[in-house]
Every structure is written in structure tokens, then in C-alpha cells.
Amino acid sequence: MSDRGNVRIALKVDVDTHDGLARGVPAIAELLARCGVSASFFIACGPDRMGRRIARLLDPRFGAKLLRTRAVAVYGWRTLLSGTLLPSRPVATAFPDALRRLAAAGHEVAVHGYDHARWQDRLPRLSEAQVRAEVTRATTVLRGILGTDPRGFAAPGWRCTPASLAAVDAAGFAYRSDTRGSYPYLPAAAGQVFRAPEIPTTLPTLDEVYGRAARRPAELADYYVGLLRPDALNVHTIHAELEGGPYVGVLDTLLARLRRRACFVRLCDEAASLATTRLPICAVREGRVPGRAMPVALQGQESPARE
């Protein structure tokens, strides 16, 4: 990144757990307020059952990531056992006032699925009716808290299928942020082009690069600044449990580097501008990204323009 002010960046804050909303979101919101920055917060709207993911320790890639990012320090045993040895706890409905405060402060509050662990681990095995129910329940919860229809949907774990793409369209969302990619597009899968535009995450997440690209906050900030593209919308997904927890210093340092050089946008505002844009059609495919244990949905090959 070179010239000051020529870079657009959207901060996408994924809130996966009860403690992420209870502790991580206030810490991130405080930092954003101090910097005068607005962000898009995507909230898991159902139960926190992250403990059910503990079975993935059998996957050496998952176990290595947990060790590299100090998962016990990040999440705590209460979250790591939630929904297994310990009862699950609600996420969105446990802190409705916190979500209203985010909206009142000018942040976008949007949907990050209902049962995050179920979606991330089982989505390909869910029926179309089950997928629709996940989307509908999440939307109903957030609408009940905010009194307005959420405009955006972000798939937990960047997992999506033709059934989930169709369910998001059917629910009336203005846009989605389900995949990893390079630029906004209309997603296509199973011979169908879907209505709601996709605004993909373009930058790697902290848990993917920590201990691989760098460790110190200043080094990580430099790493991210070096990845920014002045000719595109840069979407950086952060997690309430990480950047709002033990790694809050990384976010603080990054914001300090960016606040005078970048224009921050909310994803909902970007989606509104896309409404008048002829977007390319790109296939959605499954693949892997460095540093992440599970496969994710990726922006695939661009299709010929429609007449």
C-alpha cells in the first residue's frame, strides 16, 4: 500500500461464541470507537456448541492450529467444552442490548448462521429443509432483537452449498459474505446463478497467519498492510474471540497503521453500491487455504457475461 487514503477496507467481525459476544465484542467496539471506524458484525444467533468441534482434534491440521494460536487461552475451557461436557449457552439472545448498542453506534449487525458448530461441521450433510431452517431461525432471532431485517449473511466457517446459497436468496438478504476470494461477484453452483451478491473475505485471518507469517503485533500489522490492494475492496475478517481477546493488541496496531491511510466501509454500504453494478458470475468451489484445517468455499472461475 502506498498513497494515503487510496485503499478501501471493510472489517468483518465474526462472533461465534457466547464469550465472544460477552467479552470480545465490547473490546473491539471500544477500539473502533477510539479510531472512528465502523465495522460489520456477524453474529451467531443460536446456541454456542463449540465444544462439539473438539472431535476435530483427531485432524492433525486442526490440532496444530489450536496449539499455534493458543486456543485454550483464547477460548477458555468453558467454550471449548460448551455443548458437550458443559451445557451450551445462547449467543445473540444472551446479550440483546449489546447488539442494539452496536447498531446505535453505526455498526452493521448481521447474521452469522444459527448453530455455528453444526453449520461448519455438518452443512454438506444437512437437507435443504434443515439448511433453510438454520437461516430462517437466525434471521428471526436477529430481527426480534433489532426490530429490522438484517441485510447481510456470512456463512459459518466459509462453508456453503447450493442449498445454503438458495436459502440465503430465499430469506431476502441484500448480500452475502460466504467465501474467500478477490472481488464481489454473483455466485453460481449446480447450474444456478444466485441473486444476492457475494462480497468475499480477501485477506487471511489471524489464526491462519499467526506463527506462520509473524507473531508480534507490529510484524502482523506490517504483513497485512503489505497485502492490501489499492484497486479493490479489501475485506478483513477478524474474530471477536481472538482480536477481541488475547490478540487485541494486533488489531490495535493494525488500526493505528490504517486509520490515516485507508477508507473504512461497512459491507452493507458496499452492497448498496453494488446494486447498480453489473457483477461478474463466478463459480463457488470448495478448497483449502493455508493455515486453516477445514475446507472453505472459494471464489472460482469467472463465467462469460450474461446477455
Segments (PLM) and residue ranges:
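Positively charged, amphipathic and often flexible ligand-engagement surfaces
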Residues: 198-212
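Catalytic alpha-helical scaffold of carbohydrate-active enzymes acting on polysaccharides/glycoconjugates
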Residues: 1-152, 157-197, 215-236, 243-307
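Short, glycine-/Ser/Thr-/acidic-enriched flexible segments
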Residues: 204, 241-243
